Structure formats: C-alpha cells, structure tokens
C-alpha cells in the first residue's frame, strides 16, 4: 500500500507474492492447514471472500491480481464439505470479491469490484449453477452507472445484498430485483460490512482509508451466518 493525503491505498501485486490459497486455522493451537491452492492445475491468484452453506459446503471468490500494465482475472469456486477438491462455479470475471448466499441458499451472490456489478448464480444443487443465458451461468442483478468499486458484502435477513463501496464511500444495498440505495460513510474506502448483535442489526463496517472499524445500527437485520461466532 501507499499513503496519499492521509489515506492508506492498496497497490499492485508485490514481486515476492507467493500465490493464493485457502487456509484452515485452529483458533486454539494456531496450527495452519493449507486447504486449497489451485483448480485443475491453475493456481489461485488471490482468494478473497468465502461463505458456508448449512451443509458446510464452501463458496469462495478469487479476486485475481493486478499489475502495473495488466490484470489476472478471477473466478468463483466451490468445495464440498469434507472434500479437498476445488470446483469451478464460474471463471473469467474481472475481479470477484464479496460473496454471500440468499436466505434459502438457492442463489449465490458476488460483487465484482472493477465493474461495480452484483452478480447472481441460481443453483440447481450445491456447487452447480443453472444456465442463466446462452453465454453465462451468472446473471447481473445490478450495475452502477457512476465510478465506484464494489468490495465485500453481507446479506440481510430479507435477502438484500449490502455491498461495501469504494470511492462513493459507503454501503450500497441491492435488492434481488435490482433496485438499489446508498448509505454514505466518511471514508472513500469502505471495504467490508458484517452483522451482529442480539437482533442482528449491529453493523460492523471497515473504513480502510482511515484505518477504522466502526459499529452502527442498521435499518434491517443481517442474515446470521452458519458459523456465526
């Protein structure tokens, strides 16, 4: 990263980058186990976000990697519970980032950073997406007309997609039908949101440009994660 006008801004892939992977960490012992490093011989570039379903199946995004003059694209992947095999849900998106499941687990949502789009995969079964169009298994739920980047996301109990939004500095809430609204925060680099509290209306939001983690009340309850602490 580098500093600009008091903000911390991430940069390109460093020369000593050793590759992307999914790790399992034992919180009691600190032991680290590498779970996945590739898909069919193709190395993971930068696994970014992940979510589990009720059966313990894992969905995760690979953001890809940026360099000064080019970019490695990323994808969306699946690992069945108890398996070490990585399956590809979809590939060749620009920059898949935040990922979440609808309350009924019938749809996987992910945010593509550079295009500022929320995509959806409607599932035939865990890890298998229906064909949305002749050209893609995914469908675009919403895309933004102005310059902004989408980062991590959380799903509300009502099924809305709450996406941390860079440059516009806030949380963009996208409904399943594509309608969207924006809640602003005083930092252009809002990068993550998570829900908690007894009623799941406490929102924890990262303001990465100024290095802050804030807590605020949210107008709707968040969807409780399967392995919620």
Please give the residue ranges for each predicted region.
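Beta-rich, blade/repeat-based domains predominating
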Residues: 1-15, 39-58, 75, 86-108, ...
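Short, solvent-exposed loop/turn segments at conserved positions within beta-propeller repeat blades
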Residues: 13-20, 64-74, 113-115, 166-167, ...
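A short loop-to-beta-strand structural motif that recurs across blades of beta-propeller domains
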Residues: 20-23, 74-77, 117-119, 170-172, ...
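Hydrophobic alpha-helical segments and helix pairs
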Residues: 22-82
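Beta-propeller fold detector
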Residues: 33-37, 87-91, 130-142, 182-185, ...
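Loop/turn-rich, solvent-exposed surfaces of beta-rich toroidal or solenoidal domains
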Residues: 116-117, 121-125, 135-179
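Short loop/turn segments immediately following beta-strands, especially the blade-tip
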Residues: 120-131, 217-224
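Blade-level signature of beta-propeller repeat domains, shared across WD40, Kelch, NHL, RCC1
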Residues: 191-229
């Amino acid at each position: 990263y580098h500093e600009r006008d008091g903000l911390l801004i991430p940069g390109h892939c460093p020369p000593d980058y050793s590759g992307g992977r999914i790790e399992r960490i034992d919180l009691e012992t600190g032991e680290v186990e590498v779970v996945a490093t590739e898909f069919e011989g193709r190395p993971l570039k930068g696994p970014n976000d992940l979510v589990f379903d009720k059966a313990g199946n894992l969905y995760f995004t690979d953001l890809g990697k940026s360099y000064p003059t080019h970019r490695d694209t990323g994808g969306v992947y699946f690992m069945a519970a108890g398996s070490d095999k990585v399956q590809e849900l979809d590939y060749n998106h620009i920059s898949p980032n935040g990922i979440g499941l609808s309350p009924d687990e019938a749809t996987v949502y992910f945010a593509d950073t550079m295009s500022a789009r929320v995509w959806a995969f409607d599932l035939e079964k865990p890890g298998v997406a229906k064909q949305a169009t002749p050209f893609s298994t995914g469908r675009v739920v919403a895309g933004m007309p102005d310059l902004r980047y989408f980062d991590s996301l959380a799903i509300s109990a009502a099924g809305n997609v709450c996406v941390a939004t860079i440059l516009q500095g806030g949380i963009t809430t996208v409904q399943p039908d594509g309608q969207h609204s924006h809640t602003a925060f005083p930092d252009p680099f809002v990068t993550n949101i998570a829900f908690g509290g007894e009623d799941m209306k406490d929102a924890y939001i990262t303001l990465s440009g100024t290095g802050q983690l804030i807590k605020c009340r949210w107008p709707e309850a968040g969807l409780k994660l399967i392995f919620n602490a």
